[in-house]
C-alpha cells in the first residue's frame, strides 16, 4: 500500500473517477428520461460535477508545485490527473451538444453507448482504487484490459450508430447534430481507455526501474 503522505494523490484520483461515474450515470439518466424542456437544468447539473472535478485537478497540481517527494514521477502524476479530468470534460461535452443543437429526442443507439461509457467509468474507478497497490497488485492489469475491451465495444456501437444515422436519417440538420453527439460519446470511451493506458505506461516504467536496480547495484 502507498504510505500515508502519498495517499493524497491516489485519493484525489479516486475522487475524480467517482465524479466521472456520477457524470456518466447522469448522462444515461438524461438520455433514458429525455425531456427537451429540462435539458438546460441537466446541463447545469452536469457542469457542477465537471467543476468539482476541475477543482480536484487544480488541488493536485497545487500539491505537485510544493511537494518535495512524490509517490510517482511528477509528470506521471500530472498526466494521470489531466487524463481523468478530460473524461469529465468529454461527458459534459455530450450534454452541451444535445443542448446547443436543440435535439428533441434521443436515439436508442445513444442510450446503449451511454451505458457503455458508464461501464468504462466504473471500471476506471476500480482501477484508481487499485492503483496504490501497483507494486503487488494482481488485478491492475486485468482492469486495464477490461477498460480496453469496453472501449472496443463502444467503438463497434459507435460505428453501428453512425451507419444507422446515415442510412435512416431524413433531416440533414439532425444527422449533423447526431454525428457530433455520437463522436463525443465515443470520445468518452476513448478517454477512459487513455486513463488505463497511462496507468499501464506508469506500471511498465516502474517495473523496468525495479528490474534495473539489482543490475546497477552489481555494477553491471
Residue positions per predicted region:
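Hydrophobic/aromatic-rich structural module bridging two neighboring secondary-structure elements via a short loop
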Residues: 40-41, 45-49, 59-89
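A structural signal for well-ordered alpha-helices, especially hydrophobic packing surfaces
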Residues: 17, 21-31, 50, 54-57, ...
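Short, charged, amphipathic alpha-helical segments
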Residues: 40-47, 74-78, 108-111, 141-146, ...
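Peripheral, non-transmembrane regulatory/ligand-interaction domains of membrane transport proteins
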Residues: 2-4, 12, 30-46, 51-54, ...
Amino acid at each position: 500500500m502507498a504510505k500515508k503522505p502519498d495517499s493524497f494523490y491516489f485519493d484525489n484520483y479516486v475522487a475524480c473517477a467517482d465524479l466521472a461515474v456520477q457524470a456518466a450515470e447522469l448522462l444515461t439518466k438524461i438520455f433514458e428520461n429525455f425531456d427537451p424542456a429540462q435539458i438546460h437544468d441537466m446541463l447545469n447539473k452536469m457542469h457542477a460535477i465537471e467543476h468539482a472535478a476541475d477543482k480536484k485537478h487544480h488541488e493536485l497540481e497545487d500539491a505537485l508545485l510544493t511537494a518535495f517527494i512524490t509517490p510517482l514521477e511528477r509528470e506521471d502524476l500530472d498526466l494521470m490527473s489531466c487524463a481523468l479530468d478530460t473524461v469529465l470534460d468529454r461527458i459534459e461535452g455530450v450534454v452541451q451538444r444535445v443542448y446547443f443543437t436543440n435535439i428533441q429526442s434521443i436515439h436508442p443507439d445513444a442510450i446503449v453507448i451511454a451505458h457503455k461509457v458508464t461501464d468504462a467509468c466504473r471500471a476506471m474507478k476500480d482501477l484508481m482504487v487499485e492503483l496504490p497497490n501497483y507494486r503487488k497488485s494482481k488485478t491492475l492489469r486485468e482492469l486495464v484490459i477490461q477498460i480496453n475491451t469496453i472501449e472496443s465495444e463502444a467503438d463497434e456501437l459507435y460505428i453501428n450508430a453512425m451507419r444507422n444515422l446515415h442510412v435512416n436519417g431524413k433531416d440533414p440538420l439532425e444527422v449533423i447534430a447526431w454525428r457530433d453527439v455520437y463522436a463525443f460519446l465515443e470520445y468518452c470511451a476513448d478517454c477512459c481507455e487513455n486513463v488505463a493506458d497511462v496507468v499501464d505506461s506508469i506500471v511498465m516504467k516502474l517495473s523496468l526501474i525495479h528490474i534495473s536496480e539489482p543490475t546497477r547495484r552489481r555494477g553491471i
